[in-house]
A protein has these predicted regions:
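Peripheral, non-AAA+ core regions of ATP-driven protein-machinery
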Residues: 1-223, 227-233, 481, 499-503, ...
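Basic, amphipathic alpha-helical bundle interface domains used for macromolecular binding and assembly
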Residues: 37-45, 60, 67-77, 295, ...
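Hydrophobic residues in beta-strands of the RecA-like P-loop NTPase core, especially within AAA+ ATPase
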Residues: 106, 157, 309-316
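Short hydrophobic alpha-helical runs that function as membrane-insertion/retention elements
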Residues: 134-139, 153-156, 222-225, 245, ...
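Conserved alpha-helical scaffold flanking the Walker A/P-loop in AAA+ ATPase domains
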Residues: 213, 269-275, 285-308, 341
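Walker A/P-loop
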Residues: 223-265, 330
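Conserved inter-motif catalytic segment of the P-loop NTP-binding fold
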Residues: 250-284, 291-292, 446-455, 479, ...
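Walker B catalytic acidic pair
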Residues: 305, 311-313, 323
């Protein structure tokens, strides 16, 4: 007898439909899997047998062939345990075939028949809704995640026996409440570094604070260079706090990314907190960008919609940093394999921090630099010119004077006035972004505008254009750097609540281009 059950496999950001076919044929007892299964699916033979036996069902005493269709696409993961077991029960006459009609199933089986959670449930739920499934069958631990997709009935159970009883007796679908859009996420990614609650670092480093506001408002990438202990890391950790809240579409996409990566945890709502990812400089290319035979998202994609912080930038291998160039430009990371090609979104605000030299004290009046000019040159040669070219904002942080250290201990209320003056506040950033959405096509940020769009919608005064041309000619800026200079000037004008870009905005934008092409300015 032949039985079928619908499921799905994860490929990149998408879940593709898979039909699990089970056929019982005369022959020696055994279970054979076909359809390009990976090792985890091959091992499901033993899990399914043990789960059926320990749940009180009869194991087949004939030859069992399980096909995962379409057969030309590789499948991976233990999520096929449940559909294989249900189809096997139908094929052996222990479950009515009509009970599985229109259902999409996914879940891992324990040897005792328990249903265990698996990754990618949110993506599979979206696919099930697209395929107009009657209901989505998942383990109880995944029910809340699956319910994030509205309009899709959810059936869940803790064990295989409980699930079969529900299907046999036609118990109504679980009433998992659809989360409200305003409800915050209950968990965050375990590898995300949460920003500290203190606003102390925003009471010092005025120049860097303005750069932080520009980066938050326009989505510009930021490089901070300074001696140890001047506040680079603490400033970077404040950036997610002044970014506007995630929109519904951004929250759904970020939650889906974390579900596919397996870092979502138990949630009852969409992830609303903007991510802050701070990978160590020993992270591999696969860890930073993503990878694998069936690609998974890396730190770059997991920071989508938030901040990717690269501390000790010059300690990262140059080859890995250069691989970031195209994804940072396009906001999408494409991965090609022999059998597939997929894309992961990676629209991030990159914040990088580094010391000015190997010893870290070059330019510090209180500490003598022990590095030679050759050592400093080699130190900065670890960063390629094209990579530096993509960092819109490049600023030098000076050591905090002793007389200003007490300001670090000010309360949030004490520092509110200074924050407002420097536009380092969520309200100022939100107001600037609102202007961008109203002016720019498709609500793009200034950092995403092309040259044609910037000329058409940027509202740049003629004298500002003349000033910009003089700067480009004098500094011999590349086409990319000159375009980014205009984008930053447009963002500065938005923060100043000025409709047109003037000469003063071009002049201020130039101050944030300290290390164009080469780091000679600090050597």
């Amino acid at each position: 007898m032949l039985a079928r059950c619908s499921s799905a496999s994860i490929q990149g950001m998408e879940a593709l439909p898979v039909t699990v076919e089970v056929d019982l044929a005369p022959g020696l007892p055994g279970l054979q899997l076909v359809g390009l299964p990976d090792a985890a699916i091959q091992e499901s033979r033993e899990r399914v047998r043990a789960a059926l036996r320990n749940s009180g069902f009869r194991g087949p005493l004939v030859r069992v062939i399980v096909n995962l269709a379409p057969a030309d696409r590789r499948k991976e993961g233990p999520a096929f345990d449940l559909p294989i077991a249900l189809a096997l029960l139908v094929a052996s006459g222990q479950l009515d075939p009509q009970k599985l009609e229109g259902l999409c199933c996914a879940g891992e089986l324990g040897l005792d028949g328990s249903l265990r959670p698996c990754r990618g449930i949110l993506a599979i739920a979206c696919q099930a809704k697209t395929q107009q499934a009657k209901a989505f069958v998942v383990p109880s631990a995944n029910a809340a995640e699956a319910s994030l997709v509205g309009g899709l009935p959810i059936v869940s159970a803790q064990t295989l026996g409980q699930l079969v009883e529900q299907l046999r007796h036609g118990i109504e679908h679980n009433s998992c409440p659809h989360p409200t859009r305003e409800e915050p996420a209950t968990t965050t990614s375990p590898s995300s570094a949460s920003a500290p609650s203190s606003a102390a670092p925003l009471t010092i480093q005025h120049f860097a604070r303005k750069a932080l506001a520009i980066a938050a408002a326009g989505g510009h990438h930021l490089l901070m260079v300074g001696p140890p202990g001047c506040g680079k890391t603490m400033l970077a950790r404040q950036l997610p706090k002044i970014l506007p809240p995630l929109s519904d579409s951004e929250a759904l996409e970020l939650t889906r990314l974390q579900s596919i990566a397996g870092t979502l945890g138990n949630v009852t709502s969409l992830v609303r907190q903007r991510p802050f990812r701070a990978p160590h400089h020993s992270t591999t290319a696969a860890g930073l960008l993503g990878g694998g035979t069936n690609p998974r998202p890396g730190e770059l994609s997991l920071a989508h919609g938030g901040v990717l912080f690269l501390d000790e930038l010059t300690e990262f291998p140059r080859s890995i940093l250069d691989q970031l160039r195209q994804p940072l430009e396009e906001g999408v990371l494409w991965m090609s394999r022999a059998r597939l090609r997929c894309a992961f979104p990676c629209r991030v605000t990159l914040v990088a921090a580094t010391n000015p030299c190997p010893c870290g004290w070059h330019g510090d009046p209180s500490n003598r630099c022990r590095c030679s000019e050759l050592q400093r040159q080699r130190y900065w040669n670890r960063l390629s010119g094209p990579f530096l070219d993509r960092l819109d904002l490049q600023c030098r942080l000076e050591p905090v004077p002793t007389g200003q250290l007490r300001r670090c201990f000010k309360t949030t209320a004490d520092s509110t006035e200074n924050q407002t003056e420097d536009s380092v506040s969520p309200e100022a950033v939100q107001a600037a972004r609102t202007k961008m959405c109203q002016r720019n096509p498709s609500g793009q940020l200034n950092s995403q505008l092309s040259a044609l769009e910037l000329g058409r919608y940027g509202q740049i005064e003629e004298r500002a254009f003349q000033c910009w041309e003089q700067v480009v000619s004098k500094r011999q800026l590349s086409m990319r750097s000159s375009l980014r200079l205009l984008r930053v000037a447009r963002t500065i004008a938005d923060l100043d609540a000025v409709p047109n870009v003037g000469e003063q905005h071009i002049a201020e934008a130039i101050c944030f281009r300290s290390y164009d092409q080469t780091p000679k300015a600090i050597i």
